[in-house]
A protein has these predicted regions:
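Residues embedded in well-ordered beta-strands
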Residues: 1, 5, 69, 95-99
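Short helix-loop capping/hinge motifs at secondary-structure junctions, enriched
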Residues: 3-13, 30, 90-92, 103-110
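Residues at the C-termini of beta-strands that transition into short coil/loop
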Residues: 1-2, 26, 52, 87-89, ...
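A late-sequence structural motif
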Residues: 76, 85-124
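Residue-level preference for short coil/turn positions at secondary-structure junctions
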Residues: 18-19, 64-66, 81, 92-94
Length: 124
């Protein structure tokens, strides 16, 4: 919530979350979030509340109404007018991939070729 005591901070540390309830998808839904959960469990001063695998407006509303803190991505920063997104001081990168048809168009094939070349990454 924009009214939360931490809302004006530029970055948050794990210690900033002490005494807070942290909303996150339930264990097993995301390997990255599971890694974050393992780190959070080392800090019993933080309570974990499981949410559904996919956040919907009800989850965002609950976060705002309860003044809880929620694990989210930067892309959700404008999803709710009463919530604010603040980066954490931790290194848990989120992997992204490309999903395309088994028999892609020439344009898609060219795009994939460029991505492979630029990122020096192998796609299977």
């Amino acid at each position: 919530s924009r009214e939360h005591p931490l809302a004006n901070k530029k970055r948050l540390s794990i210690e900033d979350l002490y005494g807070e309830t942290l909303m996150m998808v339930k264990e097993g839904d995301s390997t990255v979030v599971d890694s974050i959960r393992e780190e959070i469990r080392k800090h019993p001063q933080i309570t974990i509340e499981d949410t559904p695998q996919f956040y919907d407006i009800n989850v965002f509303n609950r976060c705002e109404q309860t003044q809880n803190i929620m694990i989210t991505l930067d892309c959700w920063k404008d999803v709710h007018p009463a919530l604010v997104t603040i980066p954490m001081d931790w290194d848990f990168p989120i992997p992204y991939g490309l999903l395309y048809a088994l028999n892609p168009s020439q344009d898609v094939e060219e795009f994939i070729r460029i991505v492979k070349k630029e990122n020096n990454t192998l796609f299977e």
